[in-house]
Swiss-Prot record:
Native organism: Chlorobium phaeobacteroides (strain DSM 266 / SMG 266 / 2430)
Gene Ontology CC terms: cytosol
A Pfam family annotated for this UniProt entry: DUF179
Protein name per Swiss-Prot or TrEMBL: UPF0301 protein Cpha266_0885
Lineage top rank: taxon: Bacteria
Annotated PANTHER family: UNCHARACTERIZED PROTEIN YQGE (PTHR30327), UPF0301 PROTEIN YQGE (PTHR30327:SF1)
InterPro entries in alphabetical order: AlgH-like
Family assignment from sequence similarity: Belongs to the UPF0301 (AlgH) family.
């Protein structure tokens, strides 16, 4: 786990460590979409909200998929990750086959006409952000792990198992961590 922070870059998964108990990030899996000297930005993948995209986002009245809590920053903003950078203008590639943002009106049209499927996009309310040096400090106290990302993880609906599966994918000692109870003091 030494120098784990040095592996962090856009397109990696950020996994809350088993001892990170802060409610916003407890057992979360995030995709990092931006990481540079100014800070880091990502979205929580395993926190679907109680309401659907069609109930909260204008122009997407036909989309019955859940909206996801992207993080505690600017929770009045909507963001999206998708796999269709080939047909959405202004999208930023995070890794091959995964894109962030783009023309919202174009996305609405593509979804409403069936050119794009709801399974190819994930919507988030707010985001997770860290200023310069903040995330590095959190790594130093053991709050986070890094793992490889894939489109399968990004678009998975297995929210309850996403954290343990992602931690387990790191192998070795992480396989034990992945099976740790949420509140070991109660055992």
């Amino acid at each position: 786990m030494v120098n784990e922070f040095e592996k962090l870059q856009s397109g990696k998964l950020l996994l809350a460590s088993a001892n990170l108990l802060e409610s916003n990030f407890k057992r979360t899996v995030l995709i990092i979409c931006e990481h540079n000297e100014s800070g880091s930005l990502g979205f929580i993948l395993n926190r679907p909200m109680e309401f659907k995209v069609c109930e909260a986002v204008a122009g997407f009245e036909e989309i019955e998929e859940p909206l996801h809590m992207g993080g505690p920053v600017q929770v009045d903003t909507v963001h999206f990750l998708h796999s269709r950078g080939d047909i959405i203008d202004g999208a930023t590639e995070i890794f091959p086959g995964l894109f962030w943002g783009g023309d919202k009106n174009q996305v609405s049209f593509l979804l409403n006409t069936g050119v794009m499927q709801p399974s190819e996009i994930r919507f988030f309310l707010g985001y997770s952000g860290w200023s310069a040096g903040q995330l590095e400090e959190e790594f130093e106290i053991g709050s986070w792990y890094i793992a490889e990302a894939s489109r399968d993880v990004i678009f998975s609906d297995a929210y309850e198992r996403m954290w343990s599966r992602s931690v387990r994918s790191k192998g070795g000692e992480y396989q034990i961590v992945a099976n740790a109870p949420e509140l070991p003091g109660l055992n």
